[in-house]
Amino acid sequence: TIFLDTNTGFSGAVNVGIRAAKTPYVLLLNNDTEPDCHFIGEMVKAIERSPKIFSVSSKMIQMYHKDKMDDAGDMYSLLGWAYQRGVGRSSGGYSHPCRVFSACAGAAIYRREIFEKIGYFDEMHFAYLEDIDVGYRARIAGYDNVYCPHAVVYHVGSGTSGSKYNSFKVRLAARNNIYLNYKNMPFLQLLVNVLPIGAGMTVKYLFFKKRGFGADYLAGVKEGLATAGKCKKVGYRPEHLKNYLAIEWELFTGTLLYFYEFSLRQLEKRK
């Protein structure tokens, strides 16, 4: 057991554990989860399928609604929205392994040596979107993040922060969204995506304003813009051009998938 003197946030805490590990893989599991008995074995089997796999995301099912999915791997979109693939849909689905944009670090396994190449979880994030960020860096470097449907874990959700939306979470997520794009997108990619990202931020502001968190969202955006320069930006390398192009396509398809799943959830609610 490792004890820390201060609250370093999720990123700082897991980095201590990852650096202390002597194993080829590290498994992260939130304190509000309950894995099934085959979970670890299936995660190890999945990551051992290829040395190019950086992370494996598990099949996360809602703890108190076991017929519904919580997360089948994390995705990212042109709008700058990170989202849980499959959330709210039937847990009987999502039964096929596939590539995802990033593993959800609430229940994921990582290849430890790759952290040495791409960097660890960004401690400037403190919490929220740090798993998307490290998965993004892995994709830039040419590694894969995959989903394993056979590794099942039950998840409460917001077990530490206490609620789905609160001032702390909204502010940090808004700030970290700025960091995420600034760090990982070269200037040209940022320029290409500035309009959809701006549109996504506008929609999010209106969404949170309606729920009483508009000021918190704006505070996070302002903090992100003011401090993004302190982040360690991923340097552009010509040999990674094909990876950036593949990522741009993933952002496009991730946007389509978001609206497809959103539409299905709305239809299911009306039944």
Feature map (PLM): residue ranges:
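Glycine-rich, basic loop-to-helix element that forms the pyrophosphate-binding segment
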Residues: 3-21, 31, 42
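A short, conserved alpha-helix in the catalytic core of glycosyltransferases
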Residues: 101-152
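Non-catalytic, C-terminal membrane-associated alpha-helical segments of glycosyltransferases
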Residues: 190-271
